[in-house]
Design a protein with these regions (language model features):
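Alpha-helical structural motif
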Residues: 20, 70-74, 222, 243
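Alpha-helical transmembrane segments and their immediate interhelical/interface regions
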Residues: 6-8, 22-23, 58-73, 137-164
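Generic, well-ordered alpha-helical scaffold segments in large soluble proteins
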Residues: 20-23, 27, 81, 159, ...
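Membrane-proximal intrinsically disordered regions of secretory-pathway and membrane-system proteins
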Residues: 4-21, 50, 55-57, 265, ...
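Long, contiguous internal "core" modules enriched in hydrophobic/ aromatic residues
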Residues: 84-226, 231-262, 269-315
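Long, highly hydrophobic alpha-helical transmembrane signal-anchor segments
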Residues: 1-39, 207-230
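Membrane-interface amphipathic/juxtamembrane segments adjacent to transmembrane helices
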Residues: 24-79, 260, 264
Length: 315
């Protein structure tokens, strides 16, 4: 069973990384999106972001250098990604259960990072009672149960809301319930493992050390191995579901919500526009399904006042 857990971990992490990269690459290859024209745009310079303005309000803006700030953009993105700021401001009841779930998962990733650091320090020969290693182990021992507890409370709360709130229940598929159930089971096993067999994460550190050195040593706790299997399966499963939004949110914020680069001396934008304007229209609306117009470029340049539609019915 131990060998299986090690091999499954290697495979699961590889599947997660490859599937996540595949999803990101697929997104970046999508056709150019329509601009939302939503303000404020976080990276807007000149003090305009504070009141929802934009560079288009400047006279002859196309002749002026643009002022943008990645730091201002991150100052909006980071609180949203970590603390779900928009949900807090606009849907407080949902935030009450969604925040602990997401933040608990973030802390769980932090726990894994601490376990990796601790395993490396132990492999380097530091004794467990040394200052640095002891600090890392102590931090992991505190962070672990907090992370598991927060995520479990949030997952249970989200499941309850999907079952009882009509505004969510009407739009919930079986996948949503299965995903939450998978997290609940995995987190329950993690808490049980921590409480009964691995309160200081010594077994977990040994397992991580084995992974790093390819020393697939035996693990004596079946409960810990069950925890590993559930965690790895969940990790590998995430990129194939809507839960991938946790790592796709950066792209959705940057490329969809805030992308406002003007088409001025921008050959890459011209190339993208040329591609999408060459697509064949498939809409059936009369102002789109124009006889003889074979591309979106034809539709976009068609002037119904100068070129009456041939199929237009006359009174």
């Amino acid at each position: 069973m131990s060998q299986f857990a090690y091999l499954l971990t290697y495979i699961g992490v590889a599947v997660f990384v490859l599937a996540a990269l595949r999803r990101i690459v697929a997104y970046k290859k999508n056709p150019m999106h329509l601009r939302w024209e939503l303000y404020p745009v976080a990276h807007e310079g000149g003090g305009r972001a504070a009141y929802g303005g934009g560079y288009l309000e400047e006279l002859e803006w196309w002749n002026k250098p643009r002022e943008t700030s990645r730091l201002r953009e991150l100052s909006v993105m980071v609180p949203e990604m970590l603390f779900l700021k928009a949900a807090y401001e606009n849907n407080r009841p949902l935030w009450m259960v969604s925040f602990p779930f997401h933040f608990g998962l973030y802390l769980t990733f932090g726990l894994v990072a601490l376990l990796v650091v601790a395993a490396v320090l132990e492999l380097a020969g530091l004794p467990a009672d040394s200052g640095l290693l002891g600090l890392v182990i102590g931090a992991a021992s505190i962070l672990g149960p907090i992370a598991f507890g927060l995520a479990l409370v949030g997952a249970l709360g989200l499941l309850r809301r999907r079952l009882r709130d009509p505004s969510l229940r009407n739009y919930s598929a079986m996948e949503h319930y299965f995903n939450l159930a998978l997290f609940i089971v995995t987190l329950c096993v993690a808490i049980l493992t921590w409480a009964t067999v691995d309160t200081n994460f010594a077994i977990a550190r040994g397992f991580v050390a084995g992974l790093l050195t390819f020393n697939l040593k035996e693990v004596s706790s079946p409960l810990f191995l069950l925890q590993v299997v559930l965690a790895v399966v969940t990790l590998a499963y995430i990129p194939f579901t809507h839960m991938s939004h946790f790592f796709m949110k950066y792209f959705l914020y940057h490329d969809i919500r805030w992308e406002d680069k003007p088409n001025v001396n921008a050959p890459e934008i011209n190339e993208q526009l040329g591609e999408v304007l060459g697509y064949e229209p498939t809409w059936s609306a009369s102002h789109i399904a124009i006889p003889g117009k074979k591309s979106w470029a034809d539709v976009a340049t068609f002037n119904p006042a100068a070129e009456p539609e041939e199929n237009e019915k006359t009174e």
